[in-house]
Structures are given as C-alpha cells and as structure tokens.
C-alpha cells in the first residue's frame, strides 16, 4: 500500500461531509423553457424523443462555456439489454459471457465520440490552474472545497506520437486514461450544470445494440461494416472525423470502430458471471474496479479487425503496456503513451433522473488508492494542476483560446 498524503486525508474528510455550492445544482440545468435541459413539455412534432414522466426527452446541443465548441446529446429510451454475446457468435471471446439481463433507464448519450475540440479545452485548464494569481482568494483549492475540484491533465509528453495521425478538432480525442476521462465528465458537469459521466458497460452495450441482438447494430453481415465503422480495412491512417459514417438505429455514430470508448466498469476475464440470473438494475450490474489496472473499453477502433468492432466485443486496459514509453515516476495518471491507446477515447452519458451525490462521485473520482496516491503526489510536487470549475473559468477559457 502506498503512503497517504495529508492532502489526500483532507480530501477524503471533505468528501465524506458533502458537496459544496459548486456542484449542488447539477441536476437543475434548465433550457430556455424552464424545464430541465433536453426536456420538452409537449410531444415534439418530429424528430426522436423519449416519453418520460413530466415530459419528453429530446436531442439537444450544448456549447462549452467560453468557447464556440458544441456537442450533441441523443435521448435513448429505457429497456432491457442482454449483456454479452451468445456462444455461437462468430469472433466471440470467452470474456463476452455468460449473457446477463440488465434494465437500463432512459439516458442521453453523446451523438459522437468526444472530440479533440472538446478535450483540448479541458487540457487548457492546466495553464489556467497553474496561475497562482487566478487561483487565489475564493478560487483557491482548500480542504473544505477540494471535493469540488478537478485535476487538469498535464501537457502531453509525446504530442508528436499522440497526434501522428492528426489533431483535427473533429477527430476523437484519444490516449486519456479512464481517470482523466472521469475528471473531464466532472469538469463539463460543473461548467454546464448538467450531470455528465461515463457510461456503465451495460449502458454502453445497450446504446450500441439499439434493440438488436445481432453481432452489429445493422445485422450480422460483416460486409456492411464499411458503411458504419472505421476499422483496419478502411482506416490505416488513424481515426476519422466523428460522425462520418452511418449511425445506429438510436442515431449514435461510431459505436462500431473509430476508437474504443471508456466505460466505468472494471474488467473481469470471467465476463458477466458475477451478475447471475434474473434482471439486474444498472447500478447492480456495475462491476466497480478492484485494482488500479484493467478497466473496460468497448466498440473497437481504427486499428482493429471487424470482429473487434462487434456490439459485444470487450477489451481491458493495460496500464503497464499502455504507458510503456512514459518516463515519469509515478507514471502519468492522465495519459497513455503507447498503442493501442491512440485508438481509445470516450463518449458522454447523462441520466434522465440525476444520480445521487454518492453515486455520481464514484463516476467522477479515482476508485483505487494507487491512482489516488499518484495524483496527489504529483499535485504536491507541482507536477499536477488542481482547480474549481467556477463561473469565472469560462472567461479565462475564452481568453486562452
């Protein structure tokens, strides 16, 4: 077990106490109509919608405060997914079973994978947070508000490697760790007032399958994959701009191929054996990580063969291998340096019914003492940046563009 630091102890005490004002109203983000963002009172005359108590979930766009960068969220109806793949599916791996049933509540899912345009805004916080003048007074991180703070990713150690195949604002952001992806979702939640997070593995597969049971969301004819995915047969030069292939029946692009996408779950080579029989809720089905390594990514990437882009295909992160060229000690909690990390990205999810403070915290923060120690050690040494997503931050982001 690694040494704990005083700042970590203070953080945990604050976390046990409560959220402070910065995050107290995340569930109350409103549209111009006064309803929650993405909710309309009347049934829309056209376009996708999901009927829920009190209104209708509809697609919506958000502009990241301080920028002109937008992202779209698509409503997905609740339902039940049979997680995993049948024994006779071509290309199946042993970790894709046994199949288990999970009930999914209505959610919004990012129309596309998160882009460099979005993620570079978050990366820019490092410079802002390192400015002691801007981070003074009420904006200074202390033991009482540390629970609301976010860490910003350090500058890339090997940008030429990460961006070898491009850094177009519409290409998917890649090489971030799961911890960094989780912190991004906490940051964008604080900046917009809506509760964003990574999907659970069950939510991801439900969104990818879009009420299908075939190998792909369009069926099992692999010859059709070309129209829906960027994979090794058609994308030798890296990930493509998001949304440039056909969407699945839910209207989501790139659920097959382009880049693998982080989920919140830890990986088990036993697949879904722990879920047993019967229908589980989303929360019951989460396999929270029990070690610092091995988290689940889904969907396949541009470097992968067609069978790895199936709706049920899984892959485990491997920190030691994926950070093989990282010279830092401890290794970066925010970045990977080695393939297949250049085909690993993320996608946002938002629940129709906001999660409890206790549960959303698990989606946002480190979930293992080794990651916690690495982060806090770097911050104490001045090799990390910590700050609060306050309203003033939007103006500084604008100045930093």
Report the location of each language-model feature:
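Bacterial N-terminal signal peptides
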Residues: 10-22
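Positively charged n-region of N-terminal signal peptides that target proteins for export
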Residues: 1-4
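Functional-site microenvironments in short loops/helix caps that host divalent-cation chemistry
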Residues: 82, 86-87, 159-320
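Primarily auto-inhibitory N-terminal propeptides
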Residues: 31-62
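Surface-exposed recognition segments
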Residues: 31-35, 94-102, 212, 236-238, ...
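Active-site microenvironments of metalloenzymes and redox enzymes
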Residues: 30-37, 83-90, 103-218, 264-272, ...
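Mature N-terminal segment immediately following signal peptide/propeptide cleavage
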Residues: 66-83
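Sec/Tat signal peptide C-region and signal peptidase I cleavage site
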Residues: 25-28
């Amino acid at each position: 077990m690694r040494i704990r630091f005083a700042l970590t102890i203070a953080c945990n005490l604050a976390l046990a106490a409560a959220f402070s004002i910065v995050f107290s109203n995340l569930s109350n983000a409103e549209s111009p109509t006064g309803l929650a963002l993405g909710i309309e009172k009347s049934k829309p005359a056209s376009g996708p919608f999901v009927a829920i108590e009190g209104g209708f979930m509809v697609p919506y766009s958000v502009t990241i405060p301080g920028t002109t960068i937008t992202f779209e969220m698509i409503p997905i109806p609740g339902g039940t997914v049979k997680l995993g793949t049948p024994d006779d599916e071509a290309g199946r791996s042993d970790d894709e079973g046994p199949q288990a049933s999970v009930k999914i509540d209505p959610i919004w899912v990012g129309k596309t994978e998160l882009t460099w345009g979005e993620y570079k805004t978050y990366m820019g916080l490092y410079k802002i947070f390192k400015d002691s003048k801007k981070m003074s007074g009420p904006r200074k991180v202390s033991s009482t508000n540390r629970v609301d703070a976010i860490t910003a990713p350090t500058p890339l150690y090997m940008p030429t490697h990460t961006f070898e195949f491009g850094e177009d604002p519409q290409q998917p952001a890649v090489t971030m760790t799961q911890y960094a992806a989780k912190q991004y979702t906490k940051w964008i939640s604080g900046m917009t007032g809506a509760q964003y997070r990574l999907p659970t593995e069950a939510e991801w597969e439900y969104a990818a399958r879009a009420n299908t049971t075939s190998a792909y969301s369009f069926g099992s004819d692999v010859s059709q994959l070309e129209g829906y995915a960027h994979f090794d047969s058609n994308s030798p030069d890296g990930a493509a701009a998001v949304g440039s292939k056909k969407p699945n029946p839910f209207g989501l692009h790139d659920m097959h191929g382009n880049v693998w996408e982080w989920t919140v779950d830890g990986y088990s080579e036993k697949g879904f054996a722990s879920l047993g029989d019967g229908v589980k809720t989303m929360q019951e089905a989460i396999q929270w990580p029990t070690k610092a390594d091995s988290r689940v990514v889904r969907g396949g990437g541009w470097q992968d063969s067609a069978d790895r882009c199936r709706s049920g295909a899984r892959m485990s992160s491997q920190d030691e291998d994926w950070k093989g060229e990282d010279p830092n000690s401890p290794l970066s909690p925010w970045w990977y340096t080695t393939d297949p990390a250049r085909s690993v990205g993320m996608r946002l999810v938002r629940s129709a019914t906001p999660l409890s403070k206790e549960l959303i915290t698990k989606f946002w923060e480190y979930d293992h003492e080794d990651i916690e120690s690495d982060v806090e050690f770097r911050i104490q040494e001045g090799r990390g940046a910590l700050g609060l997503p306050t309203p003033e931050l939007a103006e500084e982001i604008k100045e930093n563009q």
